């Protein structure tokens, strides 16, 4: 699952943060940077889910207000061996979704109205399974930590520009401060994006195993990618640091599978799922209970049944 690579990248991000602190204030600056990072992450640990859900205007739904969606999430969570997460809906025309929460016991899955109106039952099952995979892998906490440290690096680098421009034993000087202000956030962004892309591939594979059908997720990714290019997500545009949370990059400026992309290219993700489907003969045994005969995805598929 690429956990070793993720750990190395996270360690590099922390080291970069301490390095910026060292350039500003020497050994004491590095120590202070570490303390600030710990305090910031502690705050994010307890509050990040509420903050991001509020940012996107998500409202919680229950079996009474969204019975089909709630039942689908409950069944997939059971198949994944997870506690039932809270379910939220965002009033946004762009089809997309994300998961948040500090652990599986305090997790939430949020989907847009555009997603519920655009996907078939099977495709929506694939998307929900992908988000549950992030919860199962504790990616929601990991991405909160990386986003928090990356943001702190940017703020610290700007602080160094104004207060680290002297030429004493500790200050990097004006040129060094300028370089730090530009390169440190850039380096943090590269590490953050590399971690995000690593976790997306892992969540795709686990999500396919949870729902049992890799091609459900592959079909959903293709449909969401096509629509996301045409329908802007204004909340995400105002808060681009949250783009990595979504199943498909919600921002208007997208790249290929390279250092500057928040996600792997959708084409590569679909190809990986197609290979997984080919290896398994089209279906996978997730290891959970068999599907409920009354499950939405055992009925005839139709467009947009969740609106």
From Swiss-Prot:
Record keyword Zinc present: yes
Compartments in which it is found: Cell inner membrane
Entries under CDD domains matching the protein: M48B_HtpX_like (cd07336)
Membrane-protein topology: Multi-pass membrane protein
Region spans: Disordered: 277-307
Assigned EC number: 3.4.24.-
Cofactor (UniProt): Zn(2+)
Major subcellular location class: membrane
GO biological process per UniProt: proteolysis
Domain of life of the native organism: Bacteria
Residue sites binding Zn(2+) per the record: 130, 134, 200
Swiss-Prot/TrEMBL keywords: Cell inner membrane, Cell membrane, Hydrolase, Membrane, Metal-binding, Metalloprotease, Protease, Transmembrane, Transmembrane helix, Zinc
Active-site residues, as the UniProt record annotates them: 131
Sequence intervals crossing the membrane: 7-27, 28-48, 145-165, 171-191
GO molecular function: metalloendopeptidase activity; zinc ion binding
Record's cofactor remark: Binds 1 zinc ion per subunit.
GO cellular component, one term: plasma membrane
Similarity annotation: Belongs to the peptidase M48B family.
Listed name of the protein: Protease HtpX homolog
Organism of origin: Nitrobacter winogradskyi (strain ATCC 25391 / DSM 10237 / CIP 104748 / NCIMB 11846 / Nb-255)
Gene designation per UniProt: htpX
